[in-house]
Amino acid sequence: MAAFSTCAAVIMSQTRISLIVAMDRKRGIGIANQLPWKLPEDLAHFKRTTTGHAIIMGRKTFDSIGRPLPGRHSIVVTRNPDWRHEGTQVAATPEQACALARHEQEAFIIGGAEIFEQTIALADRMIVTEIDAEFDCDTFFPQVDQASWQETGRESLHSAASGLDYAIVTYDRVR
């Protein structure tokens, strides 16, 4: 935990750390390294929100995307010291990833579950797409201490493309 404190101290004054995630009613976020739903409106929201900022992800999340996302500083956390991909920066730990993002206004943690688990203590904000449905998932967003978070925004929406109801909810850390 000391490493997280060090990382937080380095970046807290400069960089807001936000988690951005879409999940179903049971906190499901994926199956077989893919999204279990089609929600193009949320993908557009993700693009609008993260463009121009750093995005931090695990290697499996990067593999599921397949390429660096345009207009974003892509930082990939991996235990494999030989892993490289053009257009990305590589970090061995979430702490190193945070250090690489220290000059950014905002850095978004975009997954997967293990990276969310390792970085939730650093986050200032969570932007959660809460999908009002249940899907077959094998990957889940970690439980959070609700007392540590305050809902500061909610937009309830309906997807014309998929027929799904969902809400984009912003939570800020209680300080």
Question: Over which residues does each language-model region extend?
Answer:
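Flexible, gly/pro- and Lys/Arg-enriched active-site loops
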Residues: 13-14, 20-175
